[in-house]
Amino acid sequence: MTNGNGAPPEAVAAPQLNVLAQYTKDLSFENPNAPASLAQQQQQPAINIQINVGANNLAENEYEVTLSVEGKAESGSTVLFSFELAYAGVFRIVNVPQENLHPLIMIECPRLLFPFAREIIASAVRDGGFPPLMLDPVDFVGLYRQNMERQAQQGQPS
């Protein structure tokens, strides 16, 4: 087969996403009212979770993606526990069209990091004297769309 001028078509390299490293950048767990907060609660605590994704270009085709998860459990006006986790990975991404690069970095990379961050949070909460907190799966596509809409409304580049 030729490309019309008699020369064979150039082989199109397949897109690649490689995880080069994963690590905890920052972890904080606070149990400000222990040991009183460890007593059996009359009602389920209100748990508020915030998730954000950030990325930095480290080198050609290499990106650090950070999944930030913050949470707080409250019973009435009493804080039972709070936590912050910044869990990151270094990814090598090659042969991906430029228009697909940003969504790949901001959706697929955090999706790969999430199970590890979830386990770290569950363990930290358990080690703080509470039942493990098992985070629900995250819709990273929806999170990406929300962030893009917010940036468009604010007139900021992505």
From Swiss-Prot:
Do you know which SUPFAM superfamilies this protein is assigned to?
Answer: SecB-like
Question: InterPro entries in the record, alphabetically?
Answer: SecB, SecB-like_sf
Print the keywords alphabetically. Chaperone, Cytoplasm, Protein transport, Translocation, Transport
Which GO cellular component terms, listed alphabetically, does the Swiss-Prot or TrEMBL entry include? Answer: cytoplasm
- KW Transmembrane helix (keyword) present: no
> Is the Cytoplasm keyword given for this protein?
yes
Superkingdom, natural source: Bacteria
Q: Where in the cell is it found?
A: Cytoplasm
For this protein, what is any one GO molecular function term?
A: unfolded protein binding
GO terms for biological process, alphabetical: protein folding; protein tetramerization; protein transport
Supply the PANTHER family for this chain. Answer: PROTEIN-EXPORT PROTEIN SECB, PTHR36918
Q: Which family does it belong to?
A: Belongs to the SecB family.
Q: How does it assemble?
A: Homotetramer, a dimer of dimers. One homotetramer interacts with 1 SecA dimer.
- Briefly state the protein's biological role: One of the proteins required for the normal export of preproteins out of the cell cytoplasm. It is a molecular chaperone that binds to a subset of precursor proteins, maintaining them in a translocation-competent state. It also specifically binds to its receptor SecA.
Matching HAMAP family: SecB
Protein name as it appears in the record:
Protein-export protein SecB
